[in-house]
Amino acid sequence: EDTIKPKIMLNIFEDGQALIYNDEYISLISNDSKEIWKTKKIVHHWGTIFDDKIYIPGRKYANYPEDLDENSKKIKIGKCKVDNALVDTILILDLLTGEVLKEIEILPIISSHSILSKKLGFSKKIFSRLKTNNDQFESKFLGPSYCDDLLHLNDIKIITSDNEKFFDNAKKGDYLLSLHTMNTLVLIDHKSLKIKWFLRDEFRRQHSPNITKKGMLLVFDNKGSDKKFGESRIVEFDLLKNNFNPDFDGNESFFFQSDIRGRIQIFNDQIYVTSSQQGEVFRLNCYDENLKNCKPQILFSSNTKEKSNSIFVADFYEKDFFKKDFLNKINKK
């Protein structure tokens, strides 16, 4: 009663606090279920907590072409004529207070790039979006129109001192973004907002880029495989050698497909995968460095009576996280 009605839990902290959001607010909740702060912003998918800041995909709405920036008006998407188009942003909030520190629109950054600007508008798809109506948000079906959803940002990773070395010119704090509509990953300088690196076209409708300790970029590729054993796969790109390695794919004994969502998490060098639309969480048991040889082990399934039950797993934890001290904090009287 004292908090917003949660839709997604983004993160649980060791002191028992929880970061949650719904269609209107993002909020931090105490370990005794009291609201610490709430901020009225539309957020979605996943982001990163870094240096006491939250970096998460934000969303606004605009009418095209009148609300397009000048660079966007000069290229193909300048012909778009649509109201309430989705506008993707990098939303940065103070973790302690919920204050909005900055909100960066991504489209002007892409439109100013000599190569990626030419790729805008080639993707046509059917998707649902949230439409504003008296400050409430409801799902509305759209036809195949790229103008409604030009980028569809679905993840933000922050480059750290541990992985900046895997790129030629990355710096701690830079943004690694996953742009679903463009089938593109892009690295953006966090100060100049210039594009430093990008990777595209080797995956379709991807989510959840993750960098391993060895410089391997893992990507949940939603629709990059064939339909025989499922269209999804886990792609591995060697950032140092600049080439793709064999991927993990479905097979005769393991069907793998999530058309939407999907997430990869890494704990102690082990790969955990949420296949959201299948309602399954599995671990890849890998005995060598070839991802193709990894064996999936189902850890959780929401399926009942052989029927898929789609879930949205926002965060996955090892059981060691929930130590006695943590449980005492959330169970205190």
Predicted regions and their residues:
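Histidine-/acidic-rich catalytic cores in large beta-rich domains
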Residues: 1-333
